[in-house]
Amino acid sequence: MKPVLFELFGLKIYGYGAMIALGILAAVILLDKRSKKRGYNEDHIFNMAIVGIIGGILGGKLLYIIVDIKNIIDNPEILKDLGNGFVIYGAIIGGAISVYLYCKKKNWDVLKMLDLVVPSVALAQGFGRIGCFLAGCCYGKPTKLPIGVMFTNSPFAPSNIHLHPTQIYSSIFDFLLAFFLLWYSRKAEKSGRVFSLYVIIYGVGRVIVEFLRGDPRGNVSMLSTSQFISLFTIIIGIFVFNIDRFRKQ
């Protein structure tokens, strides 16, 4: 764990923020490169990326407030720390809605654009999870496996206990998913296939990793909030993947 990477002219550069920024930069560069090959205007793509990022930030914060509303009501000062509290599924949903609205404004094919965007999203998530590891948040359950990691003086993870490095599991998974989507996008013939595979595969992976998470978070019955949302995203993904078949029926 390394919450503060280094200091520059007295300014602390935090690992979590640095990885988020690096992930966004990598995602935008990848999106710009791929969109040019498909004839999209660079300025329009950049504007859409900004709108999507803003929507993602707002969505991530909003879902955090919804999930942790009881604790926030008891301790409203939590909201004063703008860097605290963020739910990735809220960011995905908020970003997707923003991209959808922008596509409608530009009369773009929504599914084609989502196909173009999701590899960049997965790439950004991979960097973001490294940031989680550096900060010590989103930690795993105790483990006796050699792969277990120990945090010291973390404001989030318990100290001096070997824990599953769920942040690293998620990061590796996200990077592999990004590369798979890039590969599949070259052979996908129908709009929506890349996007649908993203929400299906990410949903399945998230359900699995959540079983290893040890940090406190919201739940719906026996499932964590993210597992509950994942069930719906998987269903949506399956529907979109087979949308042509449903239309014919």
Swiss-Prot record:
Cellular component per GO, a single term: plasma membrane
Pfam families named in the record: LGT
Location in the cell: Cell membrane
Coiled-coil residue windows: none
Residues involved in a 1,2-diacyl-sn-glycero-3-phospho-(1'-sn-glycerol) binding: 129
EC number: 2.5.1.145
GO biological process, one term: lipoprotein biosynthetic process
Alphabetically ordered keywords of this record: Cell membrane, Membrane, Transferase, Transmembrane, Transmembrane helix
Pathway listed: Protein modification; lipoprotein biosynthesis (diacylglyceryl transfer)
Name of the protein this chain belongs to: Phosphatidylglycerol--prolipoprotein diacylglyceryl transferase
GO molecular-function terms, A-Z: phosphatidylglycerol-prolipoprotein diacylglyceryl transferase activity
The protein's role, per its UniProt record: Catalyzes the transfer of the diacylglyceryl group from phosphatidylglycerol to the sulfhydryl group of the N-terminal cysteine of a prolipoprotein, the first step in the formation of mature lipoproteins.
Ranges that cross the membrane: 11-31, 49-69, 82-102, 116-136, 163-183, 192-212, 223-243
Keyword Secreted applies: no
Family to which this protein belongs: Belongs to the Lgt family.
InterPro entries listed in its UniProt record: Lgt
Enzyme class: transferase
Domain of life: Bacteria
Gene for this chain: lgt
Bilayer topology term: Multi-pass membrane protein
UniProt main location, coarse: membrane
